Amino acid sequence: MIVDCHGHYTTAPAALWEWRKQQVAGQAPGELRISDDEIRESLEGAQLKLQRERGTDVTFFSPRAGSMEHHVGDAKVSADWSRTFNDIIHRVSALYPRNFVPVGMLPQSPGVSPANCIAELERCVKELGFVGFNLNPDPSGGHWTAPPLYDRFWYPVYEKMVELDVPAMVHVSSSCNPAFHFTGAHYINGDTTAFMQLIQGDLFKDFPTLRFVIPHGGGAVPYHWGRYRGLAQDMKRPPLKDHLLKNVFFDTCVYHQPGIDLLLKVIPVENILFASEMVGAVRGIDPETGHYYDDTKRYLDSTTLVSAADKKRIFEENVLRVYPRAARYLNARCRARWTTGSPRPGWCRTPPWRSRGSSPCWPAAARRSSATSPRAS
């Protein structure tokens, strides 16, 4: 099974963006009206089409990261926007339970305690079945006014993460600082800064089961692994494998073969999760390869640096280990199809709770190819 842990709803219907425009302008936006057909239309020619073409079985789907915009408006504006967009993500996952697993955004706001996020986090996980969320280490939008991630300022949300057993992807939003292009600089800055902050603190002594995913291949971290090992050593911190790597993971949103190969050479396989962020920051076709930059599955399929068994860990097992609610979510959706009637065409024919192994149900075509495909070997 191919599980993409990093997807955003970048193609949401125009009505959502108009609602947001009115909200930011201080107007009462009224009730958001988006039909199921509009949602289907926004996905069928984009994310769903690419899933089919690239062989991805399921995508973890969250609000568009650049549109979280925690620096816009006050805490009330952020709360209303988060709830609205999270509800849309829930509708997507309900319409396409086989394709999308819901991941949320939080109503963060500069200078406001993350404790204000707990109600929305609980609602998303307990009521809507979300399996994780995005945590913005810089709600100021490129000015970095929040305390570092190891600071007790963040502890209320960490305590709830541990209680609910959900991880966070540490993901900044758009930048209002003209010095930092938001996807080319601010995103990579955010990934790198988050990792360095975690080196500086002792967060995981207080929260040994807390889990973070650092996206975009970890920013500059793998390329400068020796620097960070050396800094940790100079700071009298434990080796990184003991200090962070039981709790910190990296995704594969790296858009060329040498970058993926470097990630695989530096970071332990058990700390790498497959992701593409398709229809995201980089949407074009690489003229050197003739393929989309963000078709990251091709890079993993092509590499000879890891075994077929390790590829299976990256494509499936690591993701479901870091996001334990995702395995339960997928099994529940498959169970519902078995207990309410015939399974949807393309789904496996054996109820997953009666089969051996820990994997949830996945399309039968993927299972039939397991003998020859490295993704399922």
What are these regions (language model features)?
Residues A179-Q200, F207, R211-A366, P374:
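H/E-rich (His + Asp/Glu) clusters that bind or coordinate divalent metals
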Residues D57, P63-A194:
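Active-site gating/metal-coordination segments in enzymes
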Residues L50-D57, R91-F100, L164, D202-L210, ...:
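A structural motif corresponding to the C-terminal end of an alpha-helix
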Residues H8, D138, S173-S174, G218, ...:
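Catalytic metal-binding/acid-base residues of hydrolase active sites
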Residues M1-V58, W338-G341, P345, T350-A366, ...:
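An N-terminally biased module of ancient metal coordination in phosphate/nucleic-acid-related enzymes
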Residues V3-G7, T59-F61, V101-G104, F133-L135, ...:
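Hydrophobic faces of well-ordered beta-strands that scaffold small-molecule active sites
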Residues H6, Q51, I89, C124, ...:
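Conserved, mostly hydrophobic/aromatic
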Residues S42-Q51, S113-R123, G259-L262:
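Short, acidic/polar
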